[in-house]
């Protein structure tokens, strides 16, 4: 076995500096953040039932109105995913650009039609502009790492 002689203190510092992109990542600046203004703006590439449960646990720990923009790949279990997300003020489905294996935002909206306050927007930017955010509200974009990548590129 190799002995790298790494001190515990260095391991702790390394762990504290891990940056997990698109996993409850806060967007603090940029073009899309400017649309969200002073509200908390997150992206999280959760795309399955387990990820949705963890996301929901986090969202339920927050005392604010929560707005979700969601786009997903066609091969995911959309119904199981959205069943895990509770107490959401609005859900806006979107298309994921340049992803032929994504479900269209319109189809996703149809799958979520049993939920209140579900709408469709053609793009992330249009979705953000369509949501009435009050002071202190949260906006999270989720459902696919591809969608989160698009957000980072647009921002």
Task: For each feature predicted by the language model, list its residue ranges.
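C-terminal helical cap/extension that packs against the catalytic core
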Residues: 38-41, 82-138
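Nucleotide phosphate-binding/pyrophosphate-handling subdomain across enzymes
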Residues: 1-90
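Short, active-site-adjacent cap segments at secondary-structure transitions
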Residues: 147-149
């Amino acid at each position: 076995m190799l002995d790298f002689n790494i001190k515990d203190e260095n391991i702790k510092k390394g762990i504290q500096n891990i940056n997990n992109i698109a996993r409850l990542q806060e967007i603090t600046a940029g073009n899309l953040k400017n649309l969200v203004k002073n509200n908390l703006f997150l992206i999280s590439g959760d795309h399955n039932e387990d990820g949705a449960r963890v996301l929901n646990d986090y969202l339920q720990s927050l005392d604010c109105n929560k707005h979700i923009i969601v786009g997903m790949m066609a091969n995911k279990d959309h119904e199981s995913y959205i069943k895990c997300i509770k107490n959401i003020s609005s859900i806006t489905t979107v298309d994921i650009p340049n992803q032929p294996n994504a479900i269209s935002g319109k189809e996703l909206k149809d799958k979520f039609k049993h939920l209140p306050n579900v709408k469709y927007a053609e793009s992330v930017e249009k979705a953000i502009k369509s949501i009435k955010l009050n002071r202190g509200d949260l906006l999270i974009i989720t459902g696919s790492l591809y969608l989160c990548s698009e957000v980072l590129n647009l921002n």
